[in-house]
């Protein structure tokens, strides 16, 4: 690292100011505070650092374990503030029962918390910006209640219900900040896996359970709880043994918007979707297929450009 500096991160990481991710284990013996993280735009403007999107992988959980993830129903800013003041916020939070192996992708702006009796492996943006919303009235070692950040939390929180988990198939999680894959070596039928560390990204290996050896130039033994870093451009590597692990890389940044066009004999549909496959806008126009092909294509192109212009999106963003 001293010799190569940021080059060990790979070309896909050049867009980041700092090391892009943090990996950690969180062993919750009691209910943790209700909190939310801002997105990059808000955090950079107000805190001088990046926001935080994260992923939780449930390593272990008790029989009645749950996580708070978003709201049960849409709430206004006024209701949000009132419920915090009246200690009734938990009544409108979405409690999600979890068990070992479950995954939640927590996008910035999502109110969330870890319940008691859960061991979490967390992959997150490298940021320390957290707005604490509710802390069960607990006090710190100094005898005082911990600070809450209610005004900022209300400003950044998505106050509508969320789908439990958007699909990142074939990955465990996939976004502009990290891509996470799950590895399972049972030590019998599957006891070895090979991969390549490209020039584009480092490889981070977080061992959830088991033991074995990782070979990448030299051999390193691993056991439960270990975290291994393979620098970008390291070439071929081999993981051997019996383990469960999360493997994290950084992909190229996705285009923020994609255009979908469905040309039918009667109608042509044009839609815009974001990187999470959320529909931003759409339009349906008559195809008029009896016209020359170049006229049909010209009409489709002009309509696509008009829908981009309507949404303030440049072609370079697609």
Model-derived segments and their meaning:
Residues 1-100, 110, 114-211, 215-216, ...:
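Active-site region of the double-stranded beta-helix
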Residues 309-318:
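Short beta-strand-loop/turn "lid" adjacent to the catalytic site in phosphate-handling enzymes
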Residues 187, 232, 241:
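Residues on the solvent-exposed faces and adjacent turns
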Residues 224-237:
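Low-complexity, intrinsically disordered Gly/Pro/Thr-rich segments
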Residues 211-213, 234-236, 267:
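Structural motif
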Residues 257-298, 302, 306-309:
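Short glycine-rich, Thr/Ser-proximal phosphate-binding strand/loop in the N-terminal lobe
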Residues 103:
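Glycine-rich, mobile lid/loop segments that gate access to catalytic sites or pores
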